[in-house]
Amino acid sequence: MNLNATILGQALSFILFVWFCMKYIWPPIIFAIETRQKNIEESLISLKKAEEELIIIQKKMNQIIQDSKEKASFIINEANKKKSIILEDAKSIALEESKKIFLRNQLEIDLKVMQVRKNLHKEIVDLSILIAEKIIKDNIQKDQYKYSIKKLIVSLSKDKKLI
């Protein structure tokens, strides 16, 4: 094989082309590739950190939710206890008031019964006296009734004094 000028020219132009590519084209391409690799690595690292932070935040959030549930449960239990205490107090107060009202009404009833009895007794005494007076007027001459009437009047007057 003969080395002629064409092969030498092609070899020289190929060497110049390779040198030109190595000098001016490859460095920006390599730089862009390296920059993109760094960006991808940084993104992956930040993604891992974000996932770890997310896990930590979720744990904290779950803990806060659990604490809140416990506090809410405690508050509800305390409110229920206070409610039952207030209801018991109200029941006891209402029972005491009902007893007082019952006693007051019972006293009023007893007082009215006594007044009615007095009035009834007074009316009976008045009617007895009136009947006795009529009998006396009708039978004043009869001695037989005099003793009975005097006895009745004396007993009625004694009863009247007792009232």
UniProtKB/Swiss-Prot annotation:
Family annotation (HAMAP family): ATP_synth_b_bprime
Single GO MF descriptor: proton-transporting ATP synthase activity, rotational mechanism
Subunit structure: F-type ATPases have 2 components, F(1) - the catalytic core - and F(0) - the membrane proton channel. F(1) has five subunits: alpha(3), beta(3), gamma(1), delta(1), epsilon(1). F(0) has three main subunits: a(1), b(2) and c(10-14). The alpha and beta chains form an alternating ring which encloses part of the gamma chain. F(1) is attached to F(0) by a central stalk formed by the gamma and epsilon chains, while a peripheral stalk is formed by the delta and b chains.
Described purpose of this protein according to its UniProt entry: F(1)F(0) ATP synthase produces ATP from ADP in the presence of a proton or sodium gradient. F-type ATPases consist of two structural domains, F(1) containing the extramembraneous catalytic core and F(0) containing the membrane proton channel, linked together by a central stalk and a peripheral stalk. During catalysis, ATP synthesis in the catalytic domain of F(1) is coupled via a rotary mechanism of the central stalk subunits to proton translocation.
Superkingdom assignment: Bacteria
Protein name as annotated: ATP synthase subunit b
Record GO cellular component, one term: plasma membrane
Family, per entry: Belongs to the ATPase B chain family.
Ranges that cross the membrane: 13-33
Record membrane topology: Single-pass membrane protein
InterPro entries linked to this entry: ATP_synth_B-like_membr_sf (IPR028987), ATP_synth_b/b'su_bac/chlpt (IPR002146), ATP_synth_F0_bsu_bac (IPR005864), ATP_synthase_B_chain (IPR050059)
Annotated SUPFAM superfamilies: F1F0 ATP synthase subunit B, membrane domain
Subcellular localization, as worded in the UniProt entry: Cell membrane
Record keywords, A-Z: ATP synthesis, Cell membrane, CF(0), Hydrogen ion transport, Ion transport, Membrane, Transmembrane, Transmembrane helix, Transport
Pfam families attached to this UniProt entry: ATP-synt_B
